[in-house]
UniProtKB/Swiss-Prot annotation:
Chief location bin: plastid
UniProt KW Cell membrane keyword: no
GO biological process, one term: translation
Protein name: Large ribosomal subunit protein uL11c
Organism of derivation: Cyanophora paradoxa
Localization per record: Plastid, Cyanelle
Subunit structure: Part of the ribosomal stalk of the 50S ribosomal subunit. Interacts with L10 and the large rRNA to form the base of the stalk. L10 forms an elongated spine to which L12 dimers bind in a sequential fashion forming a multimeric L10(L12)X complex.
Amino acid sequence: MAKKVIAIIKIVLPAGKATPAPPVGPALGPYGVSSVNFCKEYNAKTADKGGLVIPAEITVYDDRSYSFVLKTPPASVLIAKAASVEKGSGEPNRKKVGSITKAQLEQIAKVKFPDLNTQNLEAASRIVEGTARNMGITITD
């Protein structure tokens, strides 16, 4: 018999640096899940991805056990890293803060492809390009 799922928790944490303090503790505490054990497992799986934030989807079962799946980093984080900027523009239509090349855009689309709602790499590139445009980052050839 399969375990009964009581909650699915989505959380975004820095790779290899999760601690039981907020936001992990308050998210897992109400379900009786050990935040210390989750942090150890998360940090072990993400230790090689330093400097990125990695989303995790935690499935909590009725016997207080859990499993989690790591997602790809947010497109905005990958774009900001490629453009060497800390954050996007507050006024993306007026003020541009950086630029990335088409090759960098395609590389980011390949990384994000498993989590995007498309089966076409060209469409994935357009999705990432829209995110870059909304951050005030220009795409150059």
